[in-house]
C-alpha cells in the first residue's frame, strides 16, 4: 500500500492586511516551521511578507 503524502495544502496570509491571498503545498518533513515568502498582495498593491496560516 502507498504511504500517506508528506505534502499538505497551506494558505498564505499577508502580514500587512491579513488577507489570505495564496494557497500552496508544503512538505512537513523538510519544512517543520511556518513558511514565510515575499509575494505580491493585490489588496495592498505591493510585495509584502506572506506567512503560513493554520
From Swiss-Prot:
A Pfam short name: Ribosomal_L33
Lineage: superkingdom: Bacteria
One Gene Ontology MF term: structural constituent of ribosome
Keyword list, A-Z: Ribonucleoprotein, Ribosomal protein
Alphabetical list of InterPro entries matching this protein: Ribosomal_bL33 (IPR001705), Ribosomal_bL33_CS (IPR018264), Ribosomal_bL33_sf (IPR038584), Ribosomal_zn-bd (IPR011332)
SUPFAM superfamilies: Zn-binding ribosomal proteins (SSF57829)
Record-level GO cellular component terms: cytoplasm; ribonucleoprotein complex; ribosome
NCBIfam families xrefs: PRK00504.1, PRK00595.1, rpmG_bact
Family that this chain belongs to: Belongs to the bacterial ribosomal protein bL33 family.
Protein name from the UniProt record: Large ribosomal subunit protein bL33
Amino acid at each position: 500500500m502507498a504511504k500517506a503524502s508528506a505534502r499538505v495544502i497551506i494558505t498564505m496570509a499577508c502580514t500587512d492586511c491579513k488577507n489570505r491571498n495564496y494557497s500552496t503545498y508544503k512538505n512537513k518533513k523538510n519544512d517543520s516551521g511556518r513558511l514565510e515568502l515575499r509575494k505580491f498582495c493585490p489588496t495592498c498593491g505591493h510585495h509584502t511578507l506572506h506567512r503560513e496560516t493554520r
